[in-house]
């Protein structure tokens, strides 16, 4: 009779528990979908498992949590490079999303998830789109953990109008109904591995009534609201219209609370930070997207101040059309370096905080901290094994374990990815996704969409291709 289904032993275990313990020659034991024990390998040696993984020379840590990621935009990689955010949003991505089918969304999501699983992300928050049943199907099939939404909008002022046939262009009532249907269909399915939140697309396109509506619906259904907020290049439109920042506007409406996840938050004032902390609002920081698309998160944002005040800030990669990488190791490096460069303060965000943002703080941002984000008995078995027997990790000392992970680690170092006790990748081989088929279908669909896009003149190589 075996005590466990799976035991990972002889690794350096970064628990991310309340004491932030790191166990040399440690082990993680899994029974079903839960972590059963975390201890020294010698302590668990007399308790057999159905199978074991030898993690000698490897780190064992919680699966990474991406607090912001667009599944339906995986096939838009390359369509939004080097343009202002207004053009990116209304001129590039909205026309792309107008052409998507549910089947397109399914393959786009599998492509997205394959990249995440391969780089150690086990859970992600997707703020949504308009063909989200395809997303729900793909998350269910591939085994990753995620929460997604309908990207709500109901107000279309001059200069901030999506295409006439844009599928998100709905009334307040129709928007709320569309999101509520997704909640009813997908929320807490697949053993509570798939969840649905409410979503708001972008600040110029949201009315008072929609703010109040999503808050009421999210409270009723006990879920989150995801919202792109205070995004430099778009936040000015709200200031001109209502005479205050979007966060101040929302506070005045009485809608803010701990189930809000505000994304980007780059055009942020000190008073906005106080409001966010006062209402226990959660924040998703996407440094790679900000640097790629000049959102101003480091140059104008207040992320060090948020962290200083104790605001829960998760870390994300955004979409492959906005970053264009889903590697959370890369995101950890970015958040640990870009702010200290801008502020000229070398210890501003230490690697330990970057790892917290990618694990336990990300779980808190998504309302999932009771189940994931750390390796502790009783929590869901979302675990990754990282190979440190590589040139970019050597030498490594006890004092540099976390620093090496953040400053030198890469998603390609992830060897094994486990969600709910199920191995999704082992020895770098994906077990739940047919990668060759996903690549073929993804390329085929993307080429079809590109042929239909209205901005053909912008999609020409800058260098000659023979």
Model-derived features with residue positions:
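Active-site microenvironment of metallo-dependent hydrolases
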Residues: 1-26, 30-36, 41, 46, ...
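Divalent metal-coordination and catalytic microenvironments
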Residues: 11, 28, 33, 57, ...
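Active-site gating loops and adjacent loop-to-helix segments of metal-dependent hydrolytic enzymes
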Residues: 75-107, 150-170, 232-257, 279-282, ...
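Alpha-helical scaffold segments that flank or form the walls of functional sites
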Residues: 77-144, 175-191, 443-445, 451
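Metal-coordinating catalytic core of metallo-dependent amide/deamination hydrolases
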Residues: 137-273
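Histidine/acidic-residue-rich catalytic or RNA/ligand-binding cores of hydrolases
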Residues: 233-246, 271-278, 294-306, 322-340, ...
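His/Asp/Glu-enriched, well-ordered alpha-helical/loop segment
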Residues: 252-259, 304-395, 406-408
């Amino acid at each position: 009779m075996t005590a466990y289904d799976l035991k990972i032993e002889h690794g350096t275990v970064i628990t991310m528990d309340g004491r932030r313990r790191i166990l040399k020659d440690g082990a993680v034991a899994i029974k079903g979908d839960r972590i059963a024990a975390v201890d020294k390998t010698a302590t668990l040696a007399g308790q057999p498992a159905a199978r074991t993984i030898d993690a000698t020379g490897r780190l064992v840590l919680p699966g990474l949590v991406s607090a912001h990621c667009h599944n339906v935009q995986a096939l838009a990689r390359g369509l939004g490079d080097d343009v202002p955010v207004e053009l990116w949003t209304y001129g590039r991505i909205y026309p792309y999303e107008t052409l998507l089918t549910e089947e397109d969304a399914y393959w786009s999501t599998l492509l997205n998830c394959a990249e995440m699983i391969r780089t150690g992300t086990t859970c992600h928050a997707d703020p949504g789109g308009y063909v989200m049943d395809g997303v729900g199907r793909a998350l269910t099939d591939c085994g990753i953990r995620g929460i997604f939404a309908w990207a709500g909008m109901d107000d279309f002022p001059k200069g901030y109008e999506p295409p006439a046939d844009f599928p998100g262009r709905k009334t307040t009532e129709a928007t709320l109904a569309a999101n509520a249907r997704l909640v009813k269909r997908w929320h807490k399915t697949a053993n509570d591995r798939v969840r649905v939140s409410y979503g708001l697309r972008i600040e110029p396109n949201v009315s008072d009534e929609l703010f109040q509506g999503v808050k009421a619906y999210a409270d009723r259904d006990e879920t989150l609201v995801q919202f792109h907020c205070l995004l430099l290049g778009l936040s000015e439109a709200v200031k001109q219209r209502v005479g205050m920042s979007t966060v101040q506007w929302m506070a005045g409406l009485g809608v803010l609370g701990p189930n809000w996840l505000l994304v980007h938050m780059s055009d942020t004032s000190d008073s906005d930070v106080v409001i966010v902390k006062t209402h226990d609002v959660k924040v998703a920081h996407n440094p790679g997207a900000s640097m790629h698309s000049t959102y101003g998160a480091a140059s104008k944002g207040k992320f060090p101040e948020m962290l200083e005040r104790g605001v829960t800030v998760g870390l994300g990669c955004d979409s492959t059309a906005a970053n264009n990488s889903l590697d959370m190791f890369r995101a950890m490096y970015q958040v640990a370096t870009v702010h200290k460069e801008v502020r000229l303060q070398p210890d501003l965000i230490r690697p330990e905080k970057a790892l917290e943002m990618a694990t336990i703080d990300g779980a808190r941002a998504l309302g999932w901290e009771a189940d994931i984000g750390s390796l502790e008995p009783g929590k869901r078995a979302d675990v990754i094994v990282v190979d440190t027997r590589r040139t970019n990790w050597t030498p490594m000392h006890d004092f540099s374990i976390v620093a090496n992970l953040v400053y030198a680690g890469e998603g390609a170092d992830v060897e094994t990815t486990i969600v709910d006790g199920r191995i999704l990748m082992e020895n770098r081989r994906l077990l739940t996704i047919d990668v060759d088929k996903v690549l073929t279908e993804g390329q085929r669909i993307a080429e079809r969409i590109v042929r239909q896009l209205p901005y053909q003149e912008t999609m020409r190589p800058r260098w000659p291709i023979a």
